[in-house]
Amino acid sequence: MEPSKLFTMSDNATFAPGPVVNAADKKTFRTCFRILVLSVQAVTLILVIVTLGELVRMINDQGLSNQLSSIADKIRESATMIASAVGVMNQVIHGVTVSLPLQIEGNQNQLLSTLATIRTGKKQVSNCSTNIPLVNDLRFINGINKFIIEDYATHDFSIGHPLNMPSFIPTATSPNGCTRIPSFSLGKTHWCYTHNVINANCKDHTSSNQYISMGILVQTASGYPMFKTLKIQYLSDGLNRKSCSIATVPDGCAMYCYVSTQLETDDYAGSSPPTQKLTLLFYNDTVTERTISPTGLEGNWATLVPGVGSGIYFENKLIFPAYGGVLPNSTLGVKSAREFFRPVNPYNPCSGPQQDLDQRALRSYFPSYFSNRRVQSAFLVCAWNQILVTNCELVVPSNNQTLMGAEGRVLLINNRLLYYQRSTSWWPYELLYEISFTFTNSGQSSVNMSWIPIYSFTRPGSGNCSGENVCPTACVSGVYLDPWPLTPYSHQSGINRNFYFTGALLNSSTTRVNPTLYVSALNNLKVLAPYGNQGLFASYTTTTCFQDTGDASVYCVYIMELASNIVGEFQILPVLTRLTIT
Protein backbone atom coordinates (compact mmCIF):
# COMPACT_ATOMS: atom_id res chain seq x y z
CA MET A 1 0.00 0.00 0.00
CA GLU A 2 1.31 3.33 -0.91
CA PRO A 3 1.97 5.59 2.03
CA SER A 4 -0.72 8.11 2.83
CA LYS A 5 -0.07 11.63 1.77
CA LEU A 6 -2.20 13.04 4.67
CA PHE A 7 -2.37 12.47 8.38
CA THR A 8 -5.78 13.29 9.79
CA MET A 9 -6.25 13.45 13.55
CA SER A 10 -9.10 14.13 15.76
CA ASP A 11 -9.98 17.48 17.12
CA ASN A 12 -10.12 18.54 13.55
CA ALA A 13 -6.35 19.26 13.51
CA THR A 14 -4.80 18.65 10.27
CA PHE A 15 -0.98 18.41 9.68
CA ALA A 16 0.31 19.10 6.31
CA PRO A 17 3.52 17.29 5.37
CA GLY A 18 6.77 19.43 4.79
CA PRO A 19 8.76 19.48 1.71
CA VAL A 20 9.95 16.19 0.48
CA VAL A 21 13.81 15.71 0.82
CA ASN A 22 15.24 14.42 -2.33
CA ALA A 23 18.18 11.92 -2.77
CA ALA A 24 20.76 14.54 -3.72
CA ASP A 25 20.35 16.37 -0.44
CA LYS A 26 20.71 13.17 1.51
CA LYS A 27 23.94 12.34 -0.29
CA THR A 28 25.52 15.74 0.54
CA PHE A 29 24.70 15.30 4.21
CA ARG A 30 26.28 11.87 4.34
CA THR A 31 29.42 13.19 2.68
CA CYS A 32 29.80 15.99 5.21
CA PHE A 33 29.20 13.57 8.01
CA ARG A 34 31.79 11.17 6.71
CA ILE A 35 34.33 14.00 6.23
CA LEU A 36 33.70 15.12 9.78
CA VAL A 37 34.13 11.58 11.10
CA LEU A 38 37.30 11.07 9.08
CA SER A 39 38.68 14.40 10.31
CA VAL A 40 37.98 13.46 13.88
CA GLN A 41 39.61 10.09 13.33
CA ALA A 42 42.62 11.76 11.65
CA VAL A 43 43.00 14.22 14.50
CA THR A 44 42.66 11.36 16.94
CA LEU A 45 45.27 9.36 15.04
CA ILE A 46 47.61 12.35 14.99
CA LEU A 47 47.12 12.84 18.71
CA VAL A 48 47.78 9.15 19.27
CA ILE A 49 50.93 9.29 17.12
CA VAL A 50 52.15 12.45 18.88
CA THR A 51 51.40 10.90 22.24
CA LEU A 52 53.21 7.71 21.30
CA GLY A 53 56.16 9.75 19.98
CA GLU A 54 56.32 11.73 23.18
CA LEU A 55 56.14 8.51 25.18
CA VAL A 56 58.94 7.01 23.07
CA ARG A 57 61.00 10.19 23.47
CA MET A 58 60.46 10.14 27.21
CA ILE A 59 61.45 6.49 27.30
CA ASN A 60 64.55 7.20 25.17
CA ASP A 61 65.45 10.22 27.27
CA GLN A 62 65.24 8.10 30.35
CA GLY A 63 67.53 5.50 28.70
CA LEU A 64 70.02 8.15 27.57
CA SER A 65 69.98 9.62 31.02
CA ASN A 66 70.67 6.19 32.40
CA GLN A 67 73.46 5.72 29.88
CA LEU A 68 74.96 9.14 30.71
CA SER A 69 74.68 8.32 34.36
CA SER A 70 76.45 5.02 33.73
CA ILE A 71 79.20 6.78 31.72
CA ALA A 72 79.61 9.39 34.44
CA ASP A 73 79.96 6.62 37.01
CA LYS A 74 82.62 4.96 34.87
CA ILE A 75 84.47 8.29 34.42
CA ARG A 76 84.41 8.79 38.18
CA GLU A 77 85.78 5.28 38.64
CA SER A 78 88.51 5.97 36.04
CA ALA A 79 89.36 9.30 37.68
CA THR A 80 89.70 7.54 41.00
CA MET A 81 91.95 4.89 39.43
CA ILE A 82 94.03 7.58 37.63
CA ALA A 83 94.41 9.56 40.84
CA SER A 84 95.55 6.41 42.58
CA ALA A 85 97.97 5.64 39.71
CA VAL A 86 99.32 9.21 39.79
CA GLY A 87 99.91 8.85 43.49
CA VAL A 88 101.78 5.60 42.93
CA MET A 89 103.72 7.16 40.03
CA ASN A 90 104.71 10.13 42.20
CA GLN A 91 105.91 7.74 44.86
CA VAL A 92 107.93 5.85 42.24
CA ILE A 93 109.43 9.08 40.86
CA HIS A 94 110.31 10.27 44.36
CA GLY A 95 111.78 6.89 45.16
CA VAL A 96 113.87 6.73 41.97
CA THR A 97 115.07 10.35 41.95
CA VAL A 98 115.40 11.07 45.67
CA SER A 99 115.10 8.15 48.05
CA LEU A 100 116.95 5.53 46.02
CA PRO A 101 120.02 7.73 45.26
CA LEU A 102 120.20 8.71 48.93
CA GLN A 103 119.88 5.07 49.97
CA ILE A 104 122.54 4.03 47.45
CA GLU A 105 124.83 6.79 48.66
CA GLY A 106 124.19 5.77 52.26
CA ASN A 107 124.91 2.14 51.45
CA GLN A 108 128.03 3.18 49.58
CA ASN A 109 129.23 5.25 52.52
CA GLN A 110 128.49 2.37 54.89
CA LEU A 111 130.39 0.00 52.61
CA LEU A 112 133.33 2.39 52.37
CA SER A 113 133.28 2.81 56.13
CA THR A 114 133.34 -0.97 56.55
CA LEU A 115 136.22 -1.25 54.11
CA ALA A 116 138.07 1.44 56.02
CA THR A 117 138.05 -0.75 59.13
CA ILE A 118 139.43 -3.80 57.34
CA ARG A 119 143.14 -4.52 57.59
CA THR A 120 144.75 -7.40 55.76
CA GLY A 121 148.35 -8.31 55.17
CA LYS A 122 147.65 -10.71 52.34
CA LYS A 123 148.60 -9.63 48.84
CA GLN A 124 145.48 -9.30 46.72
CA VAL A 125 145.25 -10.38 43.11
CA SER A 126 142.79 -7.62 42.13
CA ASN A 127 143.37 -3.87 42.16
CA CYS A 128 142.88 -3.68 45.94
CA SER A 129 144.93 -2.73 48.96
CA THR A 130 147.68 -4.88 50.38
CA ASN A 131 147.61 -3.38 53.86
CA ILE A 132 145.72 -0.10 54.11
CA PRO A 133 142.54 0.13 52.03
CA LEU A 134 142.39 2.89 49.44
CA VAL A 135 139.49 4.62 51.19
CA ASN A 136 139.32 8.12 52.62
CA ASP A 137 138.39 8.65 56.25
CA LEU A 138 134.63 8.31 56.73
CA ARG A 139 134.45 11.93 57.95
CA PHE A 140 135.38 13.17 54.48
CA ILE A 141 133.80 10.65 52.11
CA ASN A 142 130.44 12.40 51.84
CA GLY A 143 131.97 15.88 51.74
CA ILE A 144 134.05 15.37 48.59
CA ASN A 145 133.02 16.85 45.23
CA LYS A 146 129.97 18.47 46.79
CA PHE A 147 128.87 22.09 46.68
CA ILE A 148 129.58 23.52 50.11
CA ILE A 149 126.75 26.07 49.84
CA GLU A 150 123.43 25.40 48.09
CA ASP A 151 121.05 28.04 49.44
CA TYR A 152 121.98 30.95 47.09
CA ALA A 153 121.96 33.26 50.12
CA THR A 154 124.52 35.99 50.77
CA HIS A 155 127.47 34.76 52.83
CA ASP A 156 130.65 36.08 54.38
CA PHE A 157 133.92 34.18 54.43
CA SER A 158 137.23 34.03 56.21
CA ILE A 159 140.32 32.05 55.21
CA GLY A 160 142.21 30.57 58.14
CA HIS A 161 145.96 30.46 58.56
CA PRO A 162 147.72 27.65 56.68
CA LEU A 163 147.62 24.43 58.67
CA ASN A 164 150.88 22.69 59.45
CA MET A 165 150.87 19.27 57.83
CA PRO A 166 153.40 17.02 56.09
CA SER A 167 153.58 17.89 52.41
CA PHE A 168 152.52 15.08 50.08
CA ILE A 169 154.43 16.78 47.24
CA PRO A 170 158.20 16.22 47.05
CA THR A 171 160.41 19.08 45.95
CA ALA A 172 163.51 19.23 43.79
CA THR A 173 166.72 18.26 45.54
CA SER A 174 169.27 20.30 43.61
CA PRO A 175 169.64 23.97 42.63
CA ASN A 176 169.29 23.00 38.96
CA GLY A 177 166.27 20.79 39.50
CA CYS A 178 162.75 21.78 38.58
CA THR A 179 159.34 20.44 39.59
CA ARG A 180 156.44 21.93 37.64
CA ILE A 181 152.93 21.49 36.31
CA PRO A 182 151.02 19.98 39.27
CA SER A 183 147.79 18.10 38.59
CA PHE A 184 145.58 16.95 41.47
CA SER A 185 142.34 14.96 41.61
CA LEU A 186 140.36 14.16 44.76
CA GLY A 187 137.81 11.37 44.47
CA LYS A 188 135.38 9.93 46.97
CA THR A 189 137.68 7.06 47.90
CA HIS A 190 141.18 8.45 47.28
CA TRP A 191 143.29 11.16 45.66
CA CYS A 192 145.81 11.17 42.79
CA TYR A 193 148.61 13.62 42.11
CA THR A 194 151.34 14.13 39.50
CA HIS A 195 153.99 16.65 38.47
CA ASN A 196 156.85 16.88 36.01
CA VAL A 197 160.44 16.56 37.23
CA ILE A 198 162.61 18.39 34.68
CA ASN A 199 166.31 17.52 34.66
CA ALA A 200 167.71 20.76 33.21
CA ASN A 201 166.19 23.74 34.98
CA CYS A 202 162.62 24.26 33.72
CA LYS A 203 163.11 23.63 29.99
CA ASP A 204 160.47 20.97 29.57
CA HIS A 205 161.35 20.10 25.96
CA THR A 206 164.60 18.40 26.94
CA SER A 207 164.49 15.54 29.44
CA SER A 208 162.13 14.87 32.31
CA ASN A 209 160.56 12.23 34.54
CA GLN A 210 157.04 12.01 35.91
CA TYR A 211 156.16 11.71 39.60
CA ILE A 212 152.80 10.12 40.46
CA SER A 213 151.27 9.39 43.85
CA MET A 214 147.98 8.22 45.28
CA GLY A 215 146.66 8.27 48.80
CA ILE A 216 143.80 8.97 51.15
CA LEU A 217 142.49 11.67 53.44
CA VAL A 218 142.92 10.88 57.13
CA GLN A 219 142.19 12.87 60.26
CA THR A 220 145.10 13.95 62.44
CA ALA A 221 145.08 14.17 66.22
CA SER A 222 144.68 17.92 65.81
CA GLY A 223 141.34 17.33 64.13
CA TYR A 224 142.16 18.55 60.65
CA PRO A 225 142.83 16.39 57.58
CA MET A 226 146.11 15.13 56.19
CA PHE A 227 146.92 13.78 52.73
CA LYS A 228 148.41 10.37 53.44
CA THR A 229 150.48 8.98 50.56
CA LEU A 230 150.07 5.23 50.04
CA LYS A 231 151.64 4.61 46.64
CA ILE A 232 154.29 6.30 44.51
CA GLN A 233 155.32 5.70 40.92
CA TYR A 234 158.29 7.46 39.36
CA LEU A 235 158.26 7.11 35.58
CA SER A 236 161.89 7.40 34.52
CA ASP A 237 162.03 5.55 31.24
CA GLY A 238 163.52 8.10 28.86
CA LEU A 239 160.16 9.41 27.63
CA ASN A 240 159.77 13.16 27.94
CA ARG A 241 156.14 13.31 29.07
CA LYS A 242 154.67 16.81 29.15
CA SER A 243 151.56 18.65 30.37
CA CYS A 244 150.18 15.58 32.13
CA SER A 245 146.62 15.52 33.51
CA ILE A 246 145.59 13.15 36.33
CA ALA A 247 142.23 11.63 37.31
CA THR A 248 141.05 9.32 40.09
CA VAL A 249 139.55 6.10 38.75
CA PRO A 250 138.33 2.93 40.51
CA ASP A 251 141.26 1.44 42.47
CA GLY A 252 143.84 3.83 41.09
CA CYS A 253 144.80 6.74 38.86
CA ALA A 254 144.70 7.53 35.15
CA MET A 255 147.15 9.96 33.57
CA TYR A 256 147.06 11.57 30.13
CA CYS A 257 150.32 12.99 28.70
CA TYR A 258 151.93 13.75 25.39
CA VAL A 259 155.54 13.02 24.49
CA SER A 260 157.75 15.55 22.73
CA THR A 261 161.39 16.64 22.69
CA GLN A 262 160.94 19.83 20.70
CA LEU A 263 159.70 23.30 21.50
CA GLU A 264 155.97 23.85 21.82
CA THR A 265 156.09 26.31 18.91
CA ASP A 266 157.65 23.61 16.72
CA ASP A 267 154.82 21.23 17.62
CA TYR A 268 152.30 23.78 16.34
CA ALA A 269 154.28 24.37 13.17
CA GLY A 270 154.22 20.67 12.28
CA SER A 271 151.54 18.66 10.54
CA SER A 272 151.50 15.44 12.58
CA PRO A 273 150.49 15.43 16.26
CA PRO A 274 152.99 14.16 18.86
CA THR A 275 152.58 10.82 20.64
CA GLN A 276 149.64 10.64 23.04
CA LYS A 277 150.04 8.47 26.15
CA LEU A 278 147.41 7.10 28.54
CA THR A 279 148.81 5.58 31.74
CA LEU A 280 146.82 3.53 34.27
CA LEU A 281 148.26 2.98 37.74
CA PHE A 282 146.43 0.72 40.18
CA TYR A 283 146.81 0.25 43.90
CA ASN A 284 148.15 -3.27 43.49
CA ASP A 285 151.22 -1.79 41.71
CA THR A 286 149.95 -2.63 38.24
CA VAL A 287 151.04 -0.06 35.66
CA THR A 288 149.63 -0.10 32.12
CA GLU A 289 150.53 2.46 29.48
CA ARG A 290 149.10 2.76 26.00
CA THR A 291 149.86 4.96 23.02
CA ILE A 292 146.50 6.25 21.87
CA SER A 293 145.20 7.74 18.65
CA PRO A 294 141.75 9.06 19.49
CA THR A 295 139.08 9.42 16.84
CA GLY A 296 139.34 12.79 15.13
CA LEU A 297 143.05 13.37 15.85
CA GLU A 298 144.87 12.41 12.66
CA GLY A 299 144.35 14.76 9.75
CA ASN A 300 142.78 17.50 11.89
CA TRP A 301 145.41 18.46 14.46
CA ALA A 302 148.98 19.70 14.11
CA THR A 303 149.43 19.13 17.83
CA LEU A 304 147.30 18.03 20.77
CA VAL A 305 148.23 18.81 24.38
CA PRO A 306 146.64 17.58 27.65
CA GLY A 307 145.04 20.36 29.66
CA VAL A 308 147.29 19.98 32.77
CA GLY A 309 144.30 20.32 35.10
CA SER A 310 142.68 17.14 36.38
CA GLY A 311 140.17 15.03 34.50
CA ILE A 312 137.21 13.05 35.83
CA TYR A 313 135.66 9.59 35.90
CA PHE A 314 132.01 10.12 34.93
CA GLU A 315 129.25 7.73 33.79
CA ASN A 316 131.74 4.97 33.08
CA LYS A 317 133.85 7.33 30.99
CA LEU A 318 137.23 8.94 31.49
CA ILE A 319 137.25 12.62 30.47
CA PHE A 320 140.37 14.80 30.21
CA PRO A 321 140.80 18.42 29.11
CA ALA A 322 142.94 19.03 26.02
CA TYR A 323 143.80 21.71 23.48
CA GLY A 324 146.04 22.19 20.46
CA GLY A 325 146.53 23.52 16.94
CA VAL A 326 144.07 22.68 14.16
CA LEU A 327 145.25 22.24 10.57
CA PRO A 328 143.63 24.98 8.45
CA ASN A 329 142.42 22.85 5.51
CA SER A 330 141.27 19.92 7.63
CA THR A 331 137.64 18.97 8.15
CA LEU A 332 137.72 20.49 11.63
CA GLY A 333 139.58 23.58 10.42
CA VAL A 334 137.06 24.30 7.67
CA LYS A 335 134.09 23.62 9.95
CA SER A 336 135.27 26.08 12.62
CA ALA A 337 136.81 28.69 10.30
CA ARG A 338 134.31 31.47 11.13
CA GLU A 339 133.52 30.56 14.73
CA PHE A 340 134.40 32.90 17.59
CA PHE A 341 133.20 33.89 21.05
CA ARG A 342 133.49 37.46 22.31
CA PRO A 343 132.38 37.93 25.93
CA VAL A 344 131.75 41.45 27.19
CA ASN A 345 132.17 42.88 30.67
CA PRO A 346 129.15 45.20 31.08
CA TYR A 347 130.97 47.07 33.85
CA ASN A 348 134.06 47.70 31.69
CA PRO A 349 133.15 47.26 28.01
CA CYS A 350 135.51 47.60 25.08
CA SER A 351 134.69 50.54 22.82
CA GLY A 352 134.72 50.44 19.04
CA PRO A 353 132.61 49.32 16.08
CA GLN A 354 131.04 45.93 16.77
CA GLN A 355 132.03 44.52 13.38
CA ASP A 356 135.65 45.48 13.97
CA LEU A 357 135.61 43.95 17.47
CA ASP A 358 134.13 40.74 16.05
CA GLN A 359 136.85 40.52 13.40
CA ARG A 360 139.53 41.04 16.03
CA ALA A 361 137.93 38.37 18.23
CA LEU A 362 138.00 35.91 15.31
CA ARG A 363 141.67 36.67 14.58
CA SER A 364 142.57 36.07 18.23
CA TYR A 365 142.14 32.30 17.67
CA PHE A 366 145.06 32.31 15.19
CA PRO A 367 148.11 33.71 17.06
CA SER A 368 151.27 34.08 14.98
CA TYR A 369 153.23 32.65 17.95
CA PHE A 370 151.67 29.28 17.12
CA SER A 371 152.19 29.49 13.33
CA ASN A 372 148.72 30.99 12.81
CA ARG A 373 147.07 27.68 13.66
CA ARG A 374 143.61 27.86 15.17
CA VAL A 375 144.18 27.08 18.85
CA GLN A 376 141.25 24.90 19.88
CA SER A 377 140.03 23.36 23.14
CA ALA A 378 138.85 19.74 23.22
CA PHE A 379 138.04 16.83 25.52
CA LEU A 380 139.57 13.38 25.40
CA VAL A 381 136.79 10.88 26.18
CA CYS A 382 137.56 7.19 26.76
CA ALA A 383 135.09 4.40 27.51
CA TRP A 384 136.23 2.87 30.80
CA ASN A 385 135.02 -0.63 29.98
CA GLN A 386 137.29 -0.57 26.92
CA ILE A 387 140.14 1.36 28.47
CA LEU A 388 142.72 -1.37 27.87
CA VAL A 389 142.08 -1.14 24.14
CA THR A 390 142.03 2.67 24.38
CA ASN A 391 138.72 3.32 22.68
CA CYS A 392 138.92 7.12 22.91
CA GLU A 393 137.55 10.04 20.92
CA LEU A 394 138.09 13.78 20.77
CA VAL A 395 134.97 15.82 21.54
CA VAL A 396 135.41 19.38 20.28
CA PRO A 397 133.28 22.28 21.57
CA SER A 398 132.09 25.04 19.27
CA ASN A 399 134.27 28.14 19.25
CA ASN A 400 131.03 30.09 19.31
CA GLN A 401 130.88 29.04 22.98
CA THR A 402 134.54 29.13 24.07
CA LEU A 403 137.56 31.36 23.74
CA MET A 404 140.88 30.36 22.18
CA GLY A 405 142.01 26.91 23.26
CA ALA A 406 144.13 26.68 26.39
CA GLU A 407 145.01 24.57 29.41
CA GLY A 408 142.03 23.60 31.51
CA ARG A 409 140.43 21.39 34.12
CA VAL A 410 137.23 19.32 34.20
CA LEU A 411 135.31 19.35 37.50
CA LEU A 412 132.50 17.07 38.66
CA ILE A 413 130.61 18.58 41.62
CA ASN A 414 127.19 17.32 42.73
CA ASN A 415 127.03 15.42 39.44
CA ARG A 416 127.35 18.71 37.53
CA LEU A 417 130.17 19.17 35.04
CA LEU A 418 132.23 22.36 34.90
CA TYR A 419 135.23 23.34 32.81
CA TYR A 420 137.93 25.83 33.71
CA GLN A 421 139.81 27.31 30.76
CA ARG A 422 143.02 29.27 31.24
CA SER A 423 142.74 32.90 30.09
CA THR A 424 145.61 32.58 27.61
CA SER A 425 144.11 34.91 25.01
CA TRP A 426 142.92 38.52 25.38
CA TRP A 427 140.12 37.94 27.94
CA PRO A 428 141.70 38.67 31.36
CA TYR A 429 139.05 37.26 33.74
CA GLU A 430 138.54 33.74 35.09
CA LEU A 431 136.95 31.47 32.50
CA LEU A 432 134.49 28.93 33.85
CA TYR A 433 131.80 27.04 31.93
CA GLU A 434 129.01 24.62 32.72
CA ILE A 435 129.25 21.74 30.26
CA SER A 436 127.07 18.83 29.18
CA PHE A 437 128.00 15.92 26.93
CA THR A 438 125.85 13.98 24.50
CA PHE A 439 127.46 10.60 24.04
CA THR A 440 126.61 8.34 21.10
CA ASN A 441 127.39 4.68 20.52
CA SER A 442 128.11 5.40 16.88
CA GLY A 443 129.11 8.69 15.37
CA GLN A 444 130.54 11.82 16.92
CA SER A 445 129.72 12.75 20.52
CA SER A 446 129.15 16.43 21.30
CA VAL A 447 129.52 18.90 24.15
CA ASN A 448 127.60 22.06 24.98
CA MET A 449 129.34 24.92 26.83
CA SER A 450 127.60 27.59 28.91
CA TRP A 451 129.84 30.47 30.02
CA ILE A 452 129.61 31.72 33.61
CA PRO A 453 130.21 35.50 33.57
CA ILE A 454 132.96 36.31 36.09
CA TYR A 455 134.42 39.83 36.32
CA SER A 456 135.83 39.96 39.85
CA PHE A 457 139.59 39.87 39.13
CA THR A 458 142.10 39.45 36.32
CA ARG A 459 145.19 37.35 35.69
CA PRO A 460 148.60 38.87 34.89
CA GLY A 461 149.49 39.15 31.22
CA SER A 462 152.14 40.67 29.02
CA GLY A 463 152.12 43.27 26.25
CA ASN A 464 148.69 44.07 24.87
CA CYS A 465 147.20 41.28 26.97
CA SER A 466 147.79 42.60 30.46
CA GLY A 467 145.17 42.18 33.13
CA GLU A 468 143.79 45.61 32.26
CA ASN A 469 143.00 44.80 28.62
CA VAL A 470 139.38 43.93 27.79
CA CYS A 471 139.50 44.26 24.00
CA PRO A 472 140.02 41.42 21.50
CA THR A 473 143.54 40.96 20.19
CA ALA A 474 145.78 38.05 19.23
CA CYS A 475 148.16 37.01 22.00
CA VAL A 476 149.44 34.11 24.08
CA SER A 477 149.72 35.11 27.72
CA GLY A 478 148.14 34.60 31.15
CA VAL A 479 148.73 31.81 33.66
CA TYR A 480 146.87 28.70 34.87
CA LEU A 481 144.79 29.61 37.98
CA ASP A 482 141.85 27.23 38.35
CA PRO A 483 138.98 28.05 40.77
CA TRP A 484 136.87 25.76 42.95
CA PRO A 485 133.12 26.56 42.90
CA LEU A 486 131.55 26.62 46.36
CA THR A 487 127.98 27.01 45.07
CA PRO A 488 126.11 25.88 41.97
CA TYR A 489 125.64 28.50 39.31
CA SER A 490 122.04 29.39 38.54
CA HIS A 491 120.74 31.05 35.38
CA GLN A 492 117.73 32.30 37.34
CA SER A 493 117.62 36.08 37.43
CA GLY A 494 118.54 37.81 40.66
CA ILE A 495 120.55 35.12 42.43
CA ASN A 496 123.65 34.78 40.25
CA ARG A 497 125.48 37.36 42.35
CA ASN A 498 125.61 34.75 45.13
CA PHE A 499 127.72 32.36 43.09
CA TYR A 500 130.90 31.88 45.13
CA PHE A 501 134.24 30.27 44.32
CA THR A 502 137.73 30.16 45.79
CA GLY A 503 141.28 29.72 44.56
CA ALA A 504 144.74 31.28 44.49
CA LEU A 505 145.34 34.27 42.20
CA LEU A 506 148.44 36.30 41.32
CA ASN A 507 147.77 39.86 42.42
CA SER A 508 149.31 41.77 39.53
CA SER A 509 148.16 42.80 36.07
CA THR A 510 151.51 42.21 34.34
CA THR A 511 153.80 39.98 36.44
CA ARG A 512 153.49 36.52 38.00
CA VAL A 513 153.91 37.70 41.57
CA ASN A 514 152.00 38.01 44.85
CA PRO A 515 150.18 34.67 45.28
CA THR A 516 146.96 35.37 47.14
CA LEU A 517 144.22 33.08 48.43
CA TYR A 518 140.74 34.42 47.78
CA VAL A 519 137.00 33.86 47.91
CA SER A 520 135.05 35.61 45.18
CA ALA A 521 131.57 36.32 43.91
CA LEU A 522 130.84 36.95 40.25
CA ASN A 523 131.62 40.66 40.33
CA ASN A 524 133.68 41.25 43.45
CA LEU A 525 136.28 39.63 45.67
CA LYS A 526 134.96 38.72 49.13
CA VAL A 527 138.23 37.83 50.88
CA LEU A 528 141.94 38.19 50.06
CA ALA A 529 144.68 36.40 52.00
CA PRO A 530 148.19 37.09 50.63
CA TYR A 531 150.66 34.22 50.89
CA GLY A 532 154.34 34.94 51.47
CA ASN A 533 156.16 38.22 51.04
CA GLN A 534 155.18 41.00 48.68
CA GLY A 535 156.74 40.39 45.27
CA LEU A 536 157.06 36.60 45.69
CA PHE A 537 157.21 34.97 42.26
CA ALA A 538 154.67 32.24 41.58
CA SER A 539 153.02 30.48 38.68
CA TYR A 540 150.37 27.75 38.31
CA THR A 541 147.80 27.19 41.07
CA THR A 542 145.11 24.53 41.43
CA THR A 543 142.48 24.42 44.18
CA THR A 544 140.26 21.70 45.67
CA CYS A 545 137.82 22.04 48.58
CA PHE A 546 135.99 19.43 50.65
CA GLN A 547 134.03 19.16 53.89
CA ASP A 548 134.45 17.24 57.12
CA THR A 549 130.89 16.02 57.59
CA GLY A 550 131.67 15.10 61.19
CA ASP A 551 131.85 18.72 62.34
CA ALA A 552 130.89 20.54 59.08
CA SER A 553 134.34 22.11 58.75
CA VAL A 554 135.32 23.19 55.24
CA TYR A 555 138.91 22.76 54.04
CA CYS A 556 140.63 23.86 50.86
CA VAL A 557 144.02 22.81 49.55
CA TYR A 558 145.67 25.41 47.33
CA ILE A 559 148.53 23.82 45.39
CA MET A 560 150.89 26.55 44.17
CA GLU A 561 154.11 26.82 42.21
CA LEU A 562 156.23 29.16 44.32
CA ALA A 563 159.67 30.56 43.54
CA SER A 564 162.58 28.89 45.29
CA ASN A 565 166.10 30.28 45.51
CA ILE A 566 167.46 27.09 47.03
CA VAL A 567 166.07 24.06 45.20
CA GLY A 568 165.23 24.90 41.63
CA GLU A 569 163.21 27.64 40.02
CA PHE A 570 159.91 26.55 41.55
CA GLN A 571 158.75 24.57 44.54
CA ILE A 572 155.25 23.08 44.46
CA LEU A 573 153.57 23.63 47.82
CA PRO A 574 150.16 22.39 49.04
CA VAL A 575 148.63 24.99 51.37
CA LEU A 576 145.78 23.60 53.48
CA THR A 577 143.43 26.09 55.14
CA ARG A 578 140.10 26.04 56.89
CA LEU A 579 137.38 28.11 55.24
CA THR A 580 134.83 29.66 57.58
CA ILE A 581 131.43 30.52 56.09
CA THR A 582 128.86 32.68 57.86
Swiss-Prot record:
One GO biological process term: symbiont entry into host cell
Compartments reported by the entry: Virion membrane; Host cell membrane
Top-level taxon of origin: Viruses
Residues in the Intravirion compartment per record: 1-34
Disulfide-linked positions: C178-C202, C192-C253, C244-C257, C350-C471, C382-C392, C465-C475, C545-C556
Pfam families according to UniProt: HN
Entry membrane topology: Single-pass type II membrane protein
Glycosylation site list: N284, N329, N400, N448, N507
UniProt topological domain (Virion surface) ranges: 56-582
Stretches assigned to coiled coil: none
Annotated site location: Binding to the glycan motifs of the host receptor: R180, K242, E264, Y323, Y369, E407, R422, R512, Y540
This protein's UniProt keywords: Disulfide bond, Glycoprotein, Hemagglutinin, Host cell membrane, Host membrane, Host-virus interaction, Hydrolase, Membrane, Signal-anchor, Transmembrane, Transmembrane helix, Viral attachment to host cell, Viral envelope protein, Virion, Virus entry into host cell
UniProt keyword Nucleotide-binding, yes or no: no
UniProt comment concerning the protein's domains: The C-terminus (head domain) is involved in binding the cellular receptor.
Protein name from the UniProt record: Hemagglutinin-neuraminidase
